[in-house]
Amino acid sequence: MIIGPYINALAIIGGAVIGAALGGRIPERLRTNLTLIFGLCSMGMGIVMVAKTTNMPAMILSVLLGTIIGELLLLEQGINKLASSAKGLVEKMFPDKPSSMNSQEEFLSKFVAIVVLFSFSGTGIFGAMNEGMSGNFDILIVKSFLDFFTAMIFATSLGISVASIFVPQTLVQVILAYSAVFIIPFVTPEMRGDFAAVGGMLMIAAGFRICNIQMFHVANMLPALFLAMPISHFWSTFS
């Protein structure tokens, strides 16, 4: 029975509710500094994930082709619209105090970045696949601890809308967990390493975005995740 993704979802909802309730009670300097730390942690974890690559050319090609596809499909623009709709829907259901965000554009920018950080992190992906294969959900429990505090801090500025992130995250994790049984027999260690490395690249980009260092179109890079394993397999076979 798969339970890890649902525990992770409850952690996000709980953290978001507490953070939205606390709001301005948390000092601005603490919210700002912790947001920077979350971005730094994202980049740090991303670097560790990138180090797992087996075929660097396959990793780079996946990121390049995936980003081109995402840019042509305007994925981030679509996610922005969904994020805006979700924000309005959630705030109607759970009235929130005025957000400290300076603009809707700033809200969307951070919202998209944390959707990627929560839903497509290497920890979540590996944890979901690991539970599907072995039934061990310890990795997702650890991720739930981290996500609880991350959601709480982000909700102090983004509001209760952060709770809605549990929807894409749970969807991704449940699909991965239930499909792992069918996928893993065909996945080599090399493919797994290159897949983790591509996810790490996205986490680094998300970290830069959260820290407002460089506004990568992270959502437009998502197709790279789906290209990573096929390209890795092709490269290992014919190189």
Feature roles, as predicted:
Residues 49-57, 73-83:
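Transmembrane alpha-helix boundary signature
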Residues 197-239:
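Long hydrophobic alpha-helical segments typical of transmembrane helices together
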Residues 1, 28-29, 75-110, 239:
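Intrinsically disordered, low-complexity non-transmembrane regions of multi-pass membrane transporters
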Residues 98-164:
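Internal active-site segments that recognize and position negatively charged phosphoryl groups
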Residues 18-31, 48-54, 153-202, 209-217:
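Transmembrane-helix boundary and interhelical-loop signature of multi-pass inner-membrane proteins
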